[in-house]
Swiss-Prot record:
Disulfide bonds: none annotated. Red blood cells. One of its GO terms (molecular function) is heme binding. Belongs to the globin family. GO terms for biological process: hydrogen peroxide catabolic process. PROSITE patterns: GLOBIN (PS01033). The keyword Transport applies. Pfam families: Globin (PF00042). It comes from Heterohyrax brucei (Yellow-spotted hyrax). Residues 3-147 form the Globin domain. Heterotetramer of two delta chains and two alpha chains. Heme b binds at residues 64, 93. This is Hemoglobin subunit deltaH.
C-alpha cells in the first residue's frame, strides 16, 4: 500500500485544484489508447479508434477520460482509504470488464506525463514524486480485487 506524507498530499491536492478533468482526462485516456493500442479492446464500442487523431477527437474517449479523472479526483478525498473507496470499481474492472490490472499503472504513468506537459514549471520534482505515489496508490487500489 502506498502512503503519502502530509507534504505529498498537499502537493497533489494543490496541483489537482488547477486540473481541468475534462482536458487532462481526455488527453490521458487518449494517449493510453494510442501509445498502448492493445488497451483499445476495452473501448471498441466507442467508435472510430483507427488513428491517433480519431482517438484524441473521439467524444466517447473524451467523456470517459473525464469520468476516469473525476474518479482520481475523488481518490484525493480518501487518500488514507483508496482500497475501500475503489473496491466496487476494482470488482467491476476485474470480474465484469476483465481489464488487465497493468493498464491502471500505465494510465497513471501517462497521467503524470500529461500533468507535467500542462503544468510545466509548477510540476517540480517534489510534485512529480507526490503524483507518482498517488497514481501508484490508485493503481494498487483498482487492482486490489485481482489479488
Amino acid at each position: 500500500m502506498v502512503r503519502l506524507t502530509d507534504s505529498e498530499k498537499a502537493e497533489v491536492v494543490s496541483l489537482w485544484s488547477k486540473v481541468d478533468e475534462k482536458i487532462i482526462g481526455s488527453e490521458a485516456l487518449g494517449r493510453l489508447l494510442v501509445i498502448y493500442p492493445w488497451t483499445q479492446r476495452f473501448f471498441e464500442h466507442f467508435g472510430d479508434l483507427s488513428t491517433a487523431d480519431a482517438i484524441m477527437k473521439n467524444p466517447r474517449v473524451q467523456a470517459h477520460g473525464e469520468k476516469v479523472l473525476s474518479s482520481f479526483g475523488e481518490g484525493l478525498n480518501h487518500l488514507d482509504n483508496l482500497r475501500g473507496t475503489f473496491a466496487q470499481l476494482s470488482e467491476l474492472h476485474c470480474d465484469e470488464l476483465h481489464v488487465d490490472p497493468e493498464n491502471f499503472r500505465l494510465l497513471g504513468n501517462i497521467l503524470v506525463v500529461v500533468l507535467a506537459r500542462h503544468y510545466g514549471k509548477e510540476f517540480t520534482l517534489e510534485v512529480q514524486a507526490a503524483c507518482q505515489k498517488f497514481v501508484a496508490g490508485m493503481a494498487n487500489a483498482l487492482a486490489h480485487k485481482y489479488h
